[in-house]
Amino acid sequence: MSLPKSVYKELADIVGTENICDRQYVLAAYRHTNPQNGIKHPSPEAVIMPSSTDEVQGIVRVCNRHKIKYNTITSLFGMGGIASQPGMLIISMRRMNRILEINEDDRYAVIEPGVRQVQLKPEVFKRGLTYPTASAGPSCSVLANFVFSGDHHIQQSSSRCSRYLLGYEWVTPTGDMVRVGSLAGESGWFCADGPGPSLRGLARGYGGWSGGLGIVTKIAIGLDAWKGPRELPTEGHSPEYKIPFPKDCHKVFIFKFPSLDHVRDAMIEMGKAEIGIAVLKFFYATEAVLFTVSANDFWELWNSGLYQKELQQALWVYLAGWTPEELAYEERVMWDIVNEIGGEPVDDTITKKYEENMDFFILVSNLQRVLKLGGGWSPAKLGADSIHHMFEVAKSIPEFFYDFIEREKILNAPHNFQIIPMEFGHMAHIELLFFFDHGQADWPQIPAEVLRKSLDNDIKHGYHAATPPPVKALTEKLGPLYSNFHKWRQRIKEAFDPNNVSNPGP
């Protein structure tokens, strides 16, 4: 099946014939998002690439007129951005890749959906500024992470990407234009909230709509002051390059503790003291992947048992100061906390890797290395609540996780979860990451099975540990844990998308 010729022509008249395609060998590329996704999605009927907000509006209005369902993509890195049903149109935003403004005085940047982390990050660094960079690598869309997800390693001193969302331009599911925040009153991009009720929470809550409520075509994001160098110093060549920072103002520490409760207490106290650019309990198996250059190197390191011994109950701390004196103060406070709670430094060979390469904290390209094992990996949890709540969630992981390990479905890494505090401990994010082998006949079912068991465990304990995925059956299952949000979500969807054309989901 393909789009009717008359509809195809309407769409081609909007963007030009060179920016729409329905050839099957091209559409095949849009059935897959990443290697670990074993679901066989249908091909879209066509892919179209607008270059402006006006063109996006025109496309959406054609879709409503002919009842054609659509979804939006940028980098195709995540689990979304595919045709969730047969007969859909994919709207690729890659041509809309302009940095429209970087305002150094009011500290915001205005961007389009196709702008990648690797485009924007160096530009703001040059100006002594930075922004929360989602832990997804350099090729990912900045806008997508601000309106959908966006967790990262340095949330201790900042927050999730969503908290930095300012004014934005939104094409509703019916093709109308809405300008949100100060932009609505023609007062510029600087503020997310204008007079009266705010619509920022309509575009996204803790998570976004996965394309289910129209298309955000421009956003402004808040910028922070950057304590690092304006031009990143690099040494070596890929994949063994390094990004060292001046050691008089930047230091990395990793401490191991007797139990997860001790890790939690140290994390809380560092938040109270408001120290650290980054403070987190990180994945230990993923860390081994990040700091090795081949699968063989990974297995040699992992089988040595070093990371299992040193990093199962560990806390990563990155301190940075404007001056050596500021750094020295934070370091003294940190050591007081660590010594009081019973922590001790991990093996020097582990910490040295971070001291030599700060990419982990600035997220230039290091994270792409998790794909190199050649198998699959997938996340579970991805929720947030208090620090204490997240550690209770972590302690419950063995209840369902060991079964998969014993059946040899996943890597034996039960502590491969991260907990990242936000805003100096006002809340925290958790993510459980697991690796599996594509050589297993049933590998496409493994991620779904782990996710299902994880959600069941959350429901059993009443944990707020998941970002409910955009699947109706799962949102209805989790809804009672989250103030019956699914009922409000459905009402909003019906009100704004009467034709149910904006990514209705599976």
Model regions: which residues?
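Conserved glycine-rich FAD pyrophosphate-binding loop
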Residues: S6-K9, N37-G38, P42-A46, G58-R61, ...
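Conserved oxyanion/phosphate-binding beta-strand-loop segments in alpha/beta enzyme cores
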Residues: E10-N34
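General beta-strand structural signal in soluble alpha/beta enzymes
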Residues: I20-Q24, M49, Y70-T74, I91-M93, ...
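Long, structured ligand/cofactor-binding scaffold of large enzymes
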Residues: R31-T130, S141, N145-H153
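Short beta-strand-to-loop capping motifs
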Residues: S51, I254-D261, W316-E325, L382-H389, ...
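FAD-binding subdomain of flavoenzyme oxidoreductases
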Residues: L100-I102, P113, V118-S259
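C-terminal cap/substrate-recognition region of VAO/PCMH-type FAD-linked oxidoreductases
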Residues: R204, A220, E231-E240, P246-P258, ...
